[in-house]
């Protein structure tokens, strides 16, 4: 099963205007204009987000949910308004939105407070072979501590999920399925709505890693039907240190707190405490209010540009990139069908280590990622130690894709391959 993403018919992006919003794109690297093709690792930030964070610190900085003074009330109002805004971006109930630092923390929260505490010894959690370590290691820890079993959905030859034995994997004792919406290595976009429907038919909950999808396409928790959704702000034009876990409020009610301290309590006695209402039960201590404000501003920015237009723009860039890489003789990993392909493309140049590829490209001002991309089991499945990865976003241009092709030619010249 794979999500069919129909090419959008929306007007093309005004790239000159968009790029003017990202000051870092004006800089040079090694005497060359910066060609930033690493947005799957982190996105660049528009001035609108920087201004929102700066404005909060300049005018409203205070601790939230505590003071009776005006600054405290303003900070609290902005923090809670940001929760509503971010929840709206993913078409979700704000009561289920917990602010966290990143996708990793969100997935650890689910693994620690749901799987480790509420599942029983012998219960099974199903993952896939394309998962980022952040959607693998927390489940390994939960399995070790709670006596859970882990099972894995394999891959097809073209980089999709092999769902031929899904019925078997979802059968008892499986209680939860946790998987990525979009692979950070292969770019594969999985058909989450169909998979979730099948899981729910078996009374299996679904936890979705949306780190690579929420920034790039319209994601609706109601349409996908998932029970948990984790994503990071820094990959979607928001500040580093911003992110969210959305969960069905009734699940958060059942789950014990992840961290203890101020804000997450209702009443504290010497021997025991009771907990605040959700989602505050999972937000111990002073939150990063500025990051929440910045993430809300990023949601505003992306919605103003238009998620459908962003996705259509990225599809055109990815098609161009795959063609350029093919023409250069590079090996490209992942699906060729744009209907199931996101904005990340992994590749290798024969007889050149990806770190060397990345180093040569960097000398030309081209920023790509090189390594295992926090996906060592997937690298073993692909039978490679590492790959180079180029990834696009709303601010990239076709000229930059051509520049990548010229960079690959330089890699071949330097290494005589």
Annotate the PLM regions:
Residues 1-417:
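Pyridoxal 5′-phosphate
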């Amino acid at each position: 099963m794979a999500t069919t993403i129909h090419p959008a018919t929306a007007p093309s992006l005004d790239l000159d205007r968009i790029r003017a919003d990202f000051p870092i794109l004006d800089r040079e690297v090694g005497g060359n204009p910066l060609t930033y093709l690493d947005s799957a690792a982190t996105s660049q930030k528009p001035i609108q987000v920087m201004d929102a964070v700066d404005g909060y610190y300049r005018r409203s900085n205070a601790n939230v949910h505590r003071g009776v003074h005006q600054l405290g009330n303003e900070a609290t109002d902005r923090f809670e308004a940001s929760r509503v805004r971010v929840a709206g971006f993913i078409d979700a109930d704000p009561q289920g939105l917990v602010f966290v630092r990143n996708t990793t923390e969100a997935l650890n929260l689910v693994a620690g407070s749901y799987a480790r505490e509420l599942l029983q010894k012998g219960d099974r959690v199903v993952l896939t072979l394309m998962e980022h370590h952040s959607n693998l290691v927390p489940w390994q820890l939960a399995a070790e501590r709670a006596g859970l079993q882990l099972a894995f959905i394999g891959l097809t030859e073209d980089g999709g999920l092999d769902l031929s034995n899904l019925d078997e994997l979802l059968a008892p004792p499986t209680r939860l399925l946790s998987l990525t919406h979009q692979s950070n290595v292969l770019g594969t976009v999985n058909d989450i709505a169909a998979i979730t429907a099948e899981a729910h038919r078996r009374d299996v909950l679904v936890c979705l890693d949306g780190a690579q999808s929420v920034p790039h396409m319209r994601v609706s928790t109601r349409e996908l039907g998932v029970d948990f959704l984790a994503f990071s702000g820094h990959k979607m034009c928001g500040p580093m240190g911003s992110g969210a876990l959305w969960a069905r409020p009734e699940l958060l009610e059942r789950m014990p707190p992840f961290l203890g301290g101020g804000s997450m309590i209702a009443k504290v006695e010497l021997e025991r405490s009771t907990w605040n209402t959700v989602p505050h039960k999972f937000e111990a201590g002073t939150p990063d209010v500025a990051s929440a404000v910045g993430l809300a501003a990023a949601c505003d920015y992306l919605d103003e540009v238009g998620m459908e237009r962003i996705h259509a723009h990225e599809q055109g860039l990815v098609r161009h990139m795959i063609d350029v890489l093919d023409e250069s003789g590079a090996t490209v990993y992942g699906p060729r069908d744009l209907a199931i392909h996101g904005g990340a493309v992994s590749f290798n140049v024969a007889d050149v280590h990806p770190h060397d590829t990345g180093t040569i490209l960097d000398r030309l001002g081209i920023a790509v990622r090189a390594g295992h991309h926090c996906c060592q089991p997937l690298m073993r499945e692909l039978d490679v130690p590492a790959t180079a990865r180029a990834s696009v976003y709303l601010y990239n241009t076709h000229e930059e894709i051509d520049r990548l092709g010229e960079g690959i030619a330089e890699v071949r010249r330097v290494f005589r391959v």
